[in-house]
């Protein structure tokens, strides 16, 4: 029974896939922004799978993956993030410097065996 329950719990977990369109001349600023999230996200209750920067090819697209046990935990994380001084400072940094031109979020679930 526990194997079935674990697969059901895993199926309910979500991963937020974030696609960023960047100003290609401000990639270094985005990298600073992303590095800050590596500490802020876990502090606020999320699992930061990672951030990915352009290396070859397209120079203005970056990605992030964040995981949560479920949507309720994601919503709790968002509330904690809004109350976190470092998180708000990082949002303000992005807004002030305008290195993110567009952001898309997709909520994914893992396919269970």
How does the language model describe each region?
Residues 2-5, 9, 32-49, 67-105:
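An amphipathic, aromatic/His-enriched active-site/gating alpha helix that lines ligand/cofactor pockets
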Residues 22-32:
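Short, surface-exposed ligand-recognition loops at beta-strand->loop->(often short) alpha-helix junctions
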Residues 19-24, 66-70:
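Short beta-strand-to-loop capping motifs
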């Amino acid at each position: 029974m526990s194997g079935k329950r674990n697969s059901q719990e895993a199926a309910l977990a979500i991963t937020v896939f974030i696609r960023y369109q960047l100003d290609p001349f401000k990639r270094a600023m985005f990298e600073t922004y992303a590095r800050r999230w590596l500490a802020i996200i876990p502090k606020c209750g999320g699992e930061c799978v990672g951030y990915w920067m352009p290396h070859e090819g397209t120079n203005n697209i970056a990605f992030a993956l964040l995981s949560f046990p479920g949507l309720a935990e994601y919503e709790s994380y968002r509330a904690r993030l809004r109350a976190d001084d470092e998180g708000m400072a990082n949002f303000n940094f992005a807004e002030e410097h305008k290195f993110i031109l567009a952001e898309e979020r997709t909520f994914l679930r893992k396919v269970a065996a």
